Amino acid sequence: MAASLRLRGAASGLRYWSRRQPPAVASLAAVCSRSMASKTPVGFIGVGNMGNPMAKNLMKHGYPLIIYDVFPDACKEFLDAGEQVVSSPADVAEKADRIITMLPTSINAIEAYSGANGILKKVKKGSLLIDSSTIDPMVSKELAKEVEKMGAVFMDAPVSGGVGAARSGNLTFMVGGVEEEFAAAQELLGCMGSNVVYCGAVGTGQAAKICNNLLLAISMIGTAEAMNLGIRLGLDPKLLAKILNMSSGRCWSSDTYNPVPGVMDGVPSANNYQGGFGTTLMAKDLGLAQDSATSTKSPILLGSQAHQIYRMMCAKGYSKKDFSSVFQFLREEETF
């Protein structure tokens, strides 16, 4: 699989691998000492909505897995498929020297790495630890320091694309860490994503993800507002979506993940906003953006408003629905 990926962007200084490019085996010559063809066990901690399909794609590429999740039921299908399931992150670290974590919050990540039964209790020297959670960049930096003390390598590699891209193996990974280890990380991440982008030092992957989700939240709210206004003005929602998507207002929220029920198939709005990326998680990510904006003295006027909207949604019963349910929220809120 790795041989089907090509290193791009050398002239611009941007390093990323894309499976969409033609194969170029020669591009693998500059890898580090880790074997790109290695099929030794890979640890995977956190097999929820995103982690589950990500882990399955590693299985499809022939990697044996060492699985842990705080909810044992989440591990059952992996156990039934013949993968090893263990009882703590420390047990994962004891059995695997390459580990991927996919967890909901900074607190969960800290516990998985530094807790009483965390990875760092039994991590091996030279291990590669990849965190695909979306967490505070400062937490990533602190975890990297702790991992380095143990003689291992930490990289942050949050994702974009949602559950659909996780299932199809088309996620985008934003990677921060030691550049010399990027190729080793890409070996695994390329099994789960179509784009693996090197962003810089530890924490820059998280920074890129926070910026992406800030824009995503704003564009989703904007799409929901525009669609709601058009419907109230008498436009057919499918027609309006078609017009937006051939005009300058087009965005991912309008053409790929439209928030209006009946406009698109295969998206949460077509399933009562079940599945997808939860409103609670979007509110969490916008909180991270708020914190980063405060620490860097960066004005995020629309981002702050988006944060308040998603927090309000969580308080009004939308916490378990997909974040595109902001359309439903706007329709039901007569105060707007």
UniProtKB/Swiss-Prot annotation:
GO cellular component, one term: mitochondrion
Residues binding NAD(+), per UniProt: 40-69, 103-104, 108, 134, 284
Localization, UniProt: Mitochondrion
Pathways per UniProt: Amino-acid degradation; L-valine degradation
Sequence positions bearing N6-acetyllysine: 60, 76, 121, 145, 149, 238, 242, 321
Range annotated as the organelle transit peptide: 1-36
Name of the protein: 3-hydroxyisobutyrate dehydrogenase, mitochondrial
